[in-house]
Amino acid sequence: MAEPRQEFDVMEDHAGTYGLGDRKDQGGYTMLQDQEGDTDAGLKESPLQTPAEDGSEEPGSETSDAKSTPTAEDVTAPLVDEGAPXKQAAAQPHTEIPEGTTAEEAGIGDTPSLEDEAAGHVTQEPESGKVVREGFLGEPGPRSXSHQLASGMPGAPLLPEGPREATRQPSGTGPEDTEGGRHAPELLKHQLLGDLHQEGPPLKRAGGKERPGIKEEVDEDRDVDESSPQDSPPSKVSPAHDGRPPQTAAREATSIPGFPAEGAIPLPVDFLSKVSTEIPASEPDGPSAGRAEGQDAPPEFTFHVEITPNVQKEQAHSEEHLGRAAFPGAPGEGPEAQGPSLGEDTKEADLPEPSEKQPAAAPRGKPISRVPQLKARMVSKSKDGTGSDDKKAKTSTRSSAKTLKNRPCLSPKHPTPGSSDPLIQPSSPAVCPEPPSSPKYVSSVTXRTGSSGAKEMKLKGADGKTKIATPRGAAPPGQKGQANATRIPAKTPPAPKTPPSSVTKQVQRRPPPAGPKSERGEPPKSGDRSGYSSPGSPGTPGSRSRTPSLPTPPTREPKKVAVVRTPPKSPSSAKSRLQTAPVPMPDLKNVKSKIGSTENLKHQPGGGKVQIINKKLDLSNVQSKCGSKDNIKHVPGGGSVQIVYKPVDLSKVTSKCGSLGNIHHKPGGGQVEVKSEKLDFKDRVQSKIGSLDNITHVPGGGNKKIETHKLTFRENAKAKTDHGAEIVYKSPVVSGDTSPRHLSNVSSTGSIDMVDSPQLATLADEVSASLAKQGL
């Protein structure tokens, strides 16, 4: 499932809106949602990962409002039942959730019904498409380029960005094929889009809102998309293959009145720009990941639906998604996406506290952009306005957070210290060196870390929410972010135990040992869960505050602090943790362990130095029992063994009973004479009751005697009617009596009878005799 999450960037306008599902899971569907959390507009299916169906990740389709090349998913998206989030969830891997799936469909938030969306979108299509384009254009990197091309080059054929398209494209398909694909025979369309149609039509049925024509349109668009070269960079993506604006193509492809611009929701341009910084990073990764995935397997399409649920829900989702994103992302793909995103995020943030804005880059294995950004938690990497406000509010926290963030790199566990470190994921400790640009991963990491992780996530949620809210919601999210930030400082106060400067120092120290520390950090995470939280991670209240649920962190923080105090048993891990967290290590000397476990604190498993001394036994003075001493020098296994063969001389042997004659007998051969004597039992044996005749009987054959008994009923038969004629019957069996047998001519009354009429009898005899002579 190395589906690039990066390609799936959830464009969340608002801290309140939050993308559901890992971007990775959600395929290339970037859900651009308004602050209102309108899933219809918000769900911008970025055809980036429509590739699952198209076989290509089409940033271009995403560019074209994710519509320029309506994928089967786009077409089917409207069809997806809004009330079947579970369906979509199941479909996400293969039944790619149509890009048009609403948040409700995705199973999150209240999304206008497909019909409502259709009504709204029909009117909004042009505008929303434009806005979306602007948003995408605002996005730096392939997306912005693709959007620009989409909006700017309506005539240009859509070039599928993802290798998936290429994989699905018939060989030889290229930009030329793109147009050819439009006009390509329905066979090609059906072949390429067969998968999409199969999935799409059922979805359409579910939606029931798509017109039958949608399939064909989608097929055409898809064929074009698929035919378009995979490798074409997202920037190449042009609006519709037909040269229509991406929105138009999208509409036609979708053919869904409700989803003309399924993802098209007018998003604040600044938000798009903010997201764009995030997206470019994710996008670079997206195409590569998309290609790999496209070739390997259709990406799972997860829809990031920005919802405006209460922050806690977002936090819970974000934790889950972050957990998924953190570990699910292939380390290779994730890092690539994160690298760019981190760079961009850093640029955008350019805030003194890169740790907050750029939590240690989540290990590349964890795509940042792909993880749905929680409204509260994910600060769009472009932290305009609110980002700075959050920073101000968090300055105190930031120092600790920075240290914490840096710690997460060192030890994935430590991401808890930095609320913005969500990117740091225990799954890839070595990758930690890049601070994750988005707090998403931190949240995922914190979620994994258990209670301490949750607390951290809460803090992250506060920080991330403020940060993310700023990019998404523009100024208002920023304010929310500030409020969150203010909250976070209160939560983070426990972190202040380590001065900000010390925290930053710790952060600096940790980054180099990121690999080992992360490894160590991961065990601490388990420790945190167990209550041990590594000193570093508990020490930083920021991690606690990360958890979106702000109210809980304060209560949890003290626990974490206590946990942090427990130093790790391994000195190296303890050192790294101490560096990361200025919190003094608890004195183990004063601690009484259960069952004297402290005694073994320094125990080094694997055995100490064991000396095996081989002492030779002096057997010279030993007295053996029963004279066994003679064999004391016996070497088992036989030394030189001599087998003496003495031929036996039988010449002088006398045999018993004259058996000597057979002494030279060679068994198994010689001349064998078999004499067979036939015994004639007839001569010697007297049979019982004359059975001797059958003594030579050969069963199943031989001479058989067939005895035939003549049935004389005909001869005795009398005619019912007196016809006065004599019936002569010649028996088929040849007997000594060749004369034909006379069947008496009997009248029913018996008036004519051989006995009664001797004349007739004589006549019959004469006739029969004459006939017999003639051979009749």
UniProtKB/Swiss-Prot annotation:
Q: Compositional bias of type Basic and acidic residues: which residue ranges?
A: 1-26, 179-189, 207-216, 314-323, 344-356, 381-393, 455-466, 517-528
Give the disulfide map: none
What does the record give under GO molecular function?
Answer: microtubule binding
Q: Which residues carry this modification: Phosphothreonine?
A: 69, 71, 111, 470, 486, 492, 498, 540, 547, 552, 566, 738, 762
Could you tell me which residues carry N6,N6-dimethyllysine?
Answer: 480, 646
According to its UniProt entry, what is the function of this protein?
Promotes microtubule assembly and stability, and might be involved in the establishment and maintenance of neuronal polarity. The C-terminus binds axonal microtubules while the N-terminus binds neural plasma membrane components, suggesting that tau functions as a linker protein between both. Axonal polarity is predetermined by tau localization (in the neuronal cell) in the domain of the cell body defined by the centrosome. The short isoforms allow plasticity of the cytoskeleton whereas the longer isoforms may preferentially play a role in its stabilization.
Print the domain comment field: The tau/MAP repeat binds to tubulin.
Protein name per the record: Microtubule-associated protein tau
Q: Which organism is it from?
A: Hylobates lar (Lar gibbon)
Q: Which gene encodes it?
A: MAPT
